[in-house]
Curated annotation (Swiss-Prot):
<feature type="transmembrane region" description="Helical">
    <location>
        <begin position="574"/>
        <end position="594"/>
    </location>
</feature>
<keyword id="KW-0406">Ion transport</keyword>
<dbReference type="GO" id="GO:0007035">
    <property type="term" value="P:vacuolar acidification"/>
</dbReference>
<feature type="transmembrane region" description="Helical">
    <location>
        <begin position="522"/>
        <end position="542"/>
    </location>
</feature>
<feature type="transmembrane region" description="Helical">
    <location>
        <begin position="373"/>
        <end position="393"/>
    </location>
</feature>
<dbReference type="GO" id="GO:0006814">
    <property type="term" value="P:sodium ion transport"/>
</dbReference>
<keyword id="KW-0813">Transport</keyword>
<comment type="similarity">
    <text>Belongs to the V-ATPase 116 kDa subunit family.</text>
</comment>
<feature type="transmembrane region" description="Helical">
    <location>
        <begin position="496"/>
        <end position="516"/>
    </location>
</feature>
<feature type="transmembrane region" description="Helical">
    <location>
        <begin position="601"/>
        <end position="621"/>
    </location>
</feature>
<keyword id="KW-0812">Transmembrane</keyword>
<keyword id="KW-0915">Sodium</keyword>
<dbReference type="GO" id="GO:0051117">
    <property type="term" value="F:ATPase binding"/>
</dbReference>
<dbReference type="InterPro" id="IPR002490">
    <property type="entry name" value="V-ATPase_116kDa_su"/>
</dbReference>
<keyword id="KW-1133">Transmembrane helix</keyword>
<dbReference type="GO" id="GO:0033179">
    <property type="term" value="C:proton-transporting V-type ATPase, V0 domain"/>
</dbReference>
<comment type="function">
    <text>Involved in ATP-driven sodium extrusion.</text>
</comment>
Length: 664
């Protein structure tokens, strides 16, 4: 397969059908809505036929939905964090269903009632939290004054005044000494800490100003005592009130936990509101008149019939006008999105292409060409039966036992497929978690290893370079093929066939001199390489207005041969990573084997599991990254440009469920 062929779909219908149309299109996940008001040559007809369309204020409705979504998320988090721990939180189990089913099973009245109940509990909880905080602060303050055995308010009179406050501990002794000079004043130290000393003093009203002057000099901070009883009495009351608050919180936590069943309902509703937000966000892209709406978008031509069938199910044929058009050259150049469609085995590898750059609409999709090489390279770098089996079983069981988000589905399938070459290369290298396979079983001789990572290093190195050479030749072939498709035959020779000729010529020379000892191969290879080099030198001369510039350009192009040497060297990492991963695993096995029997079968078991898991993670990561690098630099660089715009259909967020346009 390749880049999917797109068609421009136009929908015209009565304005009253807007919501049902948008919901149906969204459930299909197959139509990208065009912005008909974007300034573009492709939209010039809009101003001609719809000079004064109705303008839609989507922000107001989006704000309402955002407010509701915030309330839902707040309610879910509140139940999760404050509900009784013993009560199981019932989350929505991911499954596949249609958008129509999602909307039909929603009740605004039931949702509002449940949300109001939870938000009321939240309000009560927050009130208790505030009261508890106040009581805890009060308790901490009273603890510092609990040795004060009288109530300051009760002691105040016309003749005397009782004041409490704090002084920095460094100034406490000096403060006490100076206050002692006032005969009619009484100062008592109530409490102390390493930094602060707590005082209470009684002074005659006549000496109040003098006392305040001394207190000010020593940084005395006056405290307000707001209670009627003594600190000790008030402390007992605060502790009692605090315990009552804790009891109320415990009861309220149980009530919150009883709402755990609401979580799945709230998640269901959140999915609906997220879908509605997506629909609302594109309403300013479509044309509204007092009576009609006009929607235009891009649809995969293979899903065109699905769209037609869907519209026939929701509206009578006379209620909707539907047309499909091929994109114009201008639309192809500026607007048409790219959607990849490949065989189910190849499709997971599309994410590697997407990470690099999507192809332009009329460009070749490199995924099917890249996939076989990535399989071989990844398997060669992992090359362990045990790691491959774990990958396969893990990915397979994950897909069978759990409904995964679509992105994770593709990722799991990706590693399930990659497990196969990892196992195959594991047999070739005879490696099972770093241990060698037995030479025979039940008297039957086994041919493993086919290649030994200790004795056949040079063979593996040569094989790595050969695989790289094959991939480079394929890349050059694709480059030539793409030029031929555009009828650029000279460029096909210059950028593809000529370089293939040079590389094949060098191969023939090496075969003739080093392996076959046949001069015919040497002469044939030399002739092919020279002829190809001449093509690379001469073609720019004919393409350039200046012959000198053409020769210089040709010479520079031919100098690019040195880059191919670097490319081939890059493929030696296939050998290096494959050998290193197996060697590290074998070293871990040897480390545990050297342990005494008691330790080997206790701590050793845990140790080998941890070490093998670490090595497996690093091996898979290295194979993933270096495999991708070989595709991006050495392979894509020969023929692929990229720069396409991703196909973004009107669809649901799928935060909690997978939406399938087929009714379940």
């Amino acid at each position: 397969m390749a880049v999917t062929k797109m068609e421009k779909v136009t929908l015209i219908s009565d304005k009253k059908n807007r919501e049902i149309l948008l919901q149906a299109v969204q459930g299909l996940h197959a139509v990208e809505i065009r912005d008909l008001f974007q300034e573009s040559e492709n939209n010039q007809w809009v101003e001609t036929f719809f000079p004064e369309p109705e303008m839609i204020d989507k922000d107001k409705e989006l704000a309402k939905l955002s407010y509701k979504l915030t309330d839902i998320r707040t309610a879910i988090q509140f139940i999760e964090h404050h509900g009784e721990k013993s009560q199981k939180k019932q989350h929505l189990k991911r499954r596949e269903l249609s958008l129509d089913t999602l909307e039909k099973n929603y009740s605004e009245e039931a949702f509002s009632k449940k949300l109001e109940e939870v938000l009321l509990l939240k309000e009560q909880w927050e009130q208790l939290v505030d009261e508890r905080q106040q009581l805890e602060d009060q308790e901490n303050w009273l603890l510092n004054w609990q040795n004060l055995d009288l109530a300051p308010k009760a002691f105040d009179s016309q003749m005397t005044k009782l004041v409490i406050g704090t002084v920095n501990a460094k100034n406490a002794e000096s403060f006490k000494a100076e206050v002692a000079e006032i005969n009619e004043a009484y100062l008592e130290e109530i409490n102390s800490s390493p930094t602060t000393t707590y005082f209470a003093y009684i002074v005659l009203r006549a000496d109040e100003s003098r006392m305040e002057e001394i207190a000010s000099r020593y940084g005395f901070v006056k405290e307000d005592y707001l209670y009627e009883g003594t600190p000790q009495q008030q402390l007992v009351a605060a502790k009692q009130s605090l315990q009552e608050i804790k009891d109320q919180q415990k009861k309220l936590s149980s009530a919150i936990g009883a709402c755990s069943g609401y979580i799945k309902d709230f998640e269901w509703t959140e999915e609906i509101f997220l879908a509605r937000s997506e629909r609302e966000a594109i309403k300013d892209r479509i044309i509204h008149t007092p009576y009609l709406i006009l929607i235009q978008g891009w649809v995969d031509h293979e899903e065109k019939q699905e769209l037609i069938h869907m519209l026939q199910n929701i509206l009578a044929s006379e209620e909707v006008y539907l047309t499909f058009d091929e994109p114009t050259d201008n639309e192809i150049a500026e607007e048409v999105p790219t959607k990849l469609k490949n065989h189910p085995i190849v499709a997971p590898f599309e994410m590697l292409t997407e990470m690099y750059s999507l192809p332009k609409y009329e460009e070749v999709d490199p995924t099917p060409w890249m996939m076989p090489f990535y399989l071989v390279f990844f398997g060669m770098m992992v090359a362990d039966i045990g790691y491959g089996l774990l990958m396969f079983l893990g990915a397979f069981l994950l897909q069978k036992l759990v409904v995964l988000p679509r992105g994770m589905q593709r990722f799991a399938k990706f590693f399930e497929i990659l497990a196969i070459p990892s196992i195959i290369w594991g047999f070739i290298y005879s490696s099972f978690f770093g241990a060698a396979l037995p030479k025979e079983i039940f008297g039957i001789h086994l041919p493993f290893p086919i290649l030994s990572t200790t004795d056949d290093v040079n063979t593996i190195l040569i094989l790595s370079v050969i695989f790289g050479l094959i991939q480079i030749l394929v890349g050059l072939f694709i480059a030539a093929k793409e030029h031929i498709k555009r009828k650029a035959y000279v460029d096909a020779v210059n950028d593809g066939f000529a370089w293939q000729g040079i590389l094949l010529g060098i191969i023939l020379i090496l075969l003739g001199t080093m392996i076959l000892k046949n001069n015919a191969f040497v002469y044939l290879g030399g002739a092919l390489a020279v002829l190809s080099a001449v093509c690379i030198l001469i073609i720019p001369v004919f393409q350039s207005s200046s012959k000198a510039k053409g020769i210089a350009k040709g010479a520079y192009n031919l100098y690019g041969l040195t880059g191919y040497i670097g490319d081939l060297v890059s493929y030696t990492r296939l050998m290096a990573l494959g050998i290193s991963g197996g060697s590290i695993a074998a070293a871990f096995n040897m480390l545990v084997a050297f342990m005494p029997p008691a330790a080997r079968f206790s701590v050793g078991i845990l140790l080998i599991i941890v070490l093998q898991a670490l090595n497996m993670f690093l091996t898979l990561l290295s194979a993933y990254v270096h495999g991708a690098r070989l595709q991006y630099v050495e392979f894509f660089g020969k023929f692929y440009t990229g720069g396409g715009r991703s196909f973004k259909p009107l669809k649901t967020v799928e935060k909690y469920v997978n939406i399938n346009h087929k009714k379940k």
